[in-house]
Structures are given as C-alpha cells and as structure tokens.
Amino acid sequence: MKLTVLGGGGVRSAFLAKSLAYNAHRIGLTEVVFLDNSADNLAIFGEIARYVFNTIRPDIQFSTTTDPVAALQDANYIITTLRVGGDESRIRDERIALEHNTLGQETTGAGGFAMAMRSIPAILRYCRLIEEHAAEDAILFNFTNPSGLVTEAIIKSGFKRRVYGICDALSELIRELPAILGCEERDLSVECYGLNHFSWFTHFTVRGEEVTERLIASPELYQKTAMQYFSPELVRLCDNQLLNEYLYYYYYRDEALKAIQGAGETRGEQIARINQEMREALRTVDARTQPEAAFTIWMQHYLRRENSYMQNESRQEKFHTREPLTLRQFIEEPDTGGYAGVALDILEAVNSTTTKRIVVSIQNHDTLDFLRPDDVIEISCDLSRDGLKPVTPVKVPTAQKNMIACVKEYERLAVAAILQQDKSLAVRALMAHPLIGSYSLAKTLVEAYLDDEQFAAWR
C-alpha cells in the first residue's frame, strides 16, 4: 500500500515520518512518498524525515519528490498538509486584520478566510490529480488549514473519493486528562462536537462512570492542561463543557486582540523569524550526510515555536513544554500519533475487532439536527470494522447551538465564495462571522485580501 504526503517538506515532517514508520504495519504500508513543491524544503526537512523513517523501517521504500504525478501515481492513501503562500502570506493575513482592529489568527475569522482563499484552490488542483492518477479506492485525509473549510470545499467540489478532515489540536487535551482523573487514556470516554477549531467536549466517563463534575472541579485542569486559557467560571457558563483552545479567540476576543497588538509581533512574524534563523543555521550542515547535526538544529528551533504557542495571544506561558531530544532519543521515544494517528486509526479499523473513539471532520448527515446534512462538522466517532459511527452528543446547549450555526453559515458562504471566486459572497461570509459581523468591515477586509494578483479572476 502506498501513502503520499502532500506538503512533505514542512517543518513538522519528522514527526509525521516517525508516526508513519512506527505504525506502517497497521495498514500494510510498502511505500511512502513525501511531496513538496519546494526542493529546498525537501533537502532539509525531507532529509531529516527520510533518516527518521529509514532508521525505524528500512524495509519500506521512502522517497521525496517535487513531481506530483509521480507522488500520486497509484497512491492508496493521501495526507495533505500544505501551507500555501508560506510565512509571508500568513503575516500579510494577520497584519491586514490587525490594521482594521480585528483578529487575524491564521485559521479563525478574517485570517482563516484569507488562508482558505489560498488553500482551497491548491487542494482542489491536487484533488484533480488524485482522481486522475491515484488508486480508484484512494482515501484522502485533509490536515491543510483551515481544515474544516478545506474539507467542506473538497466535498462540495464534487471530489469522488472518501475524504476526512483531521486535526491534532483535540488529541492533546484528551491525552492530558487521564493524569487528572487517575485513569488510563483507553478507559476515558469523551464526546466532542462542533466545527473544526470551534468545538466543545462533554460527557466525560471513566469505565462508564460519569466524572464530568470531578474533572471540572479540579484546579489542575486549569493549570496543567490546554484548559489553562479558560476560567472555571466560563466552563460553568458553558454548561460544564470543556473548550477547544481556539475558542479562546471568541470568549476572550478583546483580551486576545489587545495582547497581540501589544506583543510587537504577530504569531506569523514570530514563526517567520524562528524559521529564518533555523534555515540559516541549517545551511551550515548537510542534512543527508550529517543527520544528527541537522536534527539538533531543527529540534532547537522547533521547540522555540512549540513552547511559545499562544504566548502572545494569552500572555501565558504554556504549562506543558517539551525538552530537546537527541536524534536517537527522538526515534526511540514512544510515538503519540498526532494527526497521522487519526488517519491510521481510521484505516486500521476496517480490519480490527476493537472499537476506538476518535474526532474527525465529516459530513453531518443527521448527527447535529440544527445543521444541514451536507455541512462538515467536527465530531466524535466510534470506529470499528463496520466503519465510522458519529456520536450524537448527549446535550448541546442553546448557546453553543447558536454559536455553531452562526460560524457554520460563515463557512458555507466562504466555501461558496472561494469555489465561485465571488467577491459579494465573500463579503456576506465575513458579515456572518461573529468576530467581524459588520458590512463595512467585511467589505474592507475582502478588498484588502483580494488586492493581490493571484486573485485577479475574482469578480
């Protein structure tokens, strides 16, 4: 079985290579290809990924390429992890929003729309190549942000293969909870519902016993997990439901905007600076012949990115920070799966006798009765050899229903605007978004984002 990664020259490629290598046996992988349109990125990050993969599974063919046809030829599984436009476009997205006193976070609000304007056309070009060259039963896993919007656009474009939206923002919180509850992760059951980067967690049970009240009453929840950005009072106001970390930009909008404006640089500018310093250091070594030296440089700079996550936005230090590892330690450390783990769980399930719960973005059908059947939602699913069974949440409070419905309307309009390259629909989309909600602001933002030659065909 052949698996292809679109965007395989990204900074996080080593993690993906490690996860695929350790889990290749679960889905019978015989070939892995990392594709990227940047030969420079493949020469650095692709080579580190190659070394990691080959050290773990030297018996499986691993290659990197800039040729999309060769990469996708007869591919059975495809994972997309693209960043179209790179750091420069991200900075532009953020700065345009901030100039108009609104949040420009890369997957949320105005910034998320601007990113989708670039991501969706690029993904759809690859989708056409997948239909032409990949295996007839190929399965696509989309991790390209904004993942929910991109996944919905893929489905509504008429793409004929199975597609799932995957995200690793949810698994981190779920992995942190067993330490607070004194249980194993396999014994904890959680329901998640909503939209990508806009979801809530509810109905926590350990071996069938309800533990929600005990969990939300624990001070450690707000000190030692991704819930550190939220107050216990807010959790109570949300009907005792935990929050996806991206909801910080909604429930703490004013504080987040003030913090970002006062930080002196946006997250995109911070990442670009770290990446530039990393590239300069990596130019002093050859990643193919000096993998340990290249890995050490990469790890040092990667952790600067990882450990500073949400610092500017929340004015908080991240509780769980990572310590640097040597290349050998990285390879030998147990794999936690990440977004590759979700994809592997789905693929393995058809041949398994066990049931496992994951969170994935799929079409709603009748899972959330206040949304349309063709809407893409983010939802807990029970996996078994019978397939994916969405878990209808026990309770969706009215406030959450209204918020989800509002953002979903934005997503519908945004996807339609991008598929049709329609400026008026784009304005309607941003008008509907709760972080914007203004005709004059929406029109100004759309005109600013469209002021680029790549959007010349928009009307």
Set out the residue ranges of the language-model regions.
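Gly/Ser/Thr-rich loops at beta-strand to alpha-helix junctions
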Residues: G9-S13, A39-D40, N142-V150, A169-E172
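Redox-cofactor binding/interface segments in oxidoreductases and associated redox assembly factors
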Residues: Q73, I79-T80, N142
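Rossmann-fold NAD(P)-binding glycine/threonine-rich loop
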Residues: V84, E88-S157
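Acidic, His- and aromatic-enriched active-site or binding-groove loops in soluble protein domains
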Residues: K160-L177
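Long, compositionally biased stretches enriched for glycine and/or charged residues
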Residues: G182-R459
